[in-house]
């Protein structure tokens, strides 16, 4: 099955189960990047009427993929004790071919990720035709927020997505973005700051100062 076929089948499976969803990840980033990039999987942010983990697992398995669960500590890279004890919340169901764990697949991002719930609501008015009809997709602001949240892992592709989006010089609702950065207390890693716009780094610093101020006795 091609990645495009898997994309369409995934959308059908999500709709059949009445799941609120939006295209995220590489396909969403390509809507706003200066140039497209290669992606090996399809990401959807989701919100279900029942248990998110159970429904997401069933959807992935209905596509003929093996379902794995990623927790907050897994994505953040630690702390090690949290990974071992599985003490942090599930935040993603990872679907990959059982015979090829590094092959093309589907990732379902759960609302335990702080940006997902609000991004899903905004995406319902941002429909994009990926070749098989209109599908909700992350707005440019929420695409940026998703990548800023992922930056703590310091993956090259997350930083590259952000750089390419800003290089494209598309219109961005900066007041909204500033409010969400403050609300989610997004802290840009120092190593990434030189590669991002100064105004964005300043927003992150302001959010960090505000968070520290709230925590003072």
Positions of PLM-derived features:
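Compositionally biased terminal segments of proteins
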Residues: 1-217
């Amino acid at each position: 099955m091609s990645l495009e076929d898997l994309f369409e089948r995934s959308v059908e499976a999500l709709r059949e189960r009445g799941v609120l969803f939006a295209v995220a990840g590489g396909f969403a980033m390509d809507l706003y990047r200066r140039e497209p990039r290669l992606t090996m999987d399809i990401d959807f942010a989701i919100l279900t009427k029942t248990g998110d983990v159970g429904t997401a697992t069933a959807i992935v398995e209905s596509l003929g993929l093996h379902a794995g669960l990623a927790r907050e500590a897994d994505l953040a890279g630690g702390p090690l004790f949290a990974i071992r004890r599985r003490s942090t919340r599930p935040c993603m169901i990872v679907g990959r071919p059982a015979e090829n764990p590094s092959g093309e697949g589907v990732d379902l991002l759960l609302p335990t990720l702080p940006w997902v719930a609000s991004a899903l609501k905004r995406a319902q008015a941002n429909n994009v035709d990926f070749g098989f009809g209109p599908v909700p997709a992350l707005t440019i602001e929420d695409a940026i927020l998703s990548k800023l949240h992922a930056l703590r892992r310091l993956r090259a592709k997350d930083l590259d997505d952000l750089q390419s989006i800003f290089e494209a010089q598309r219109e961005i609702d900066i007041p909204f973005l500033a409010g969400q950065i403050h609300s989610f207390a997004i802290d840009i890693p120092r190593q990434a700051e030189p590669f991002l716009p100064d105004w964005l780094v300043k927003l992150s610093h302001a959010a960090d100062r505000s968070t520290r101020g709230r925590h003072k006795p």
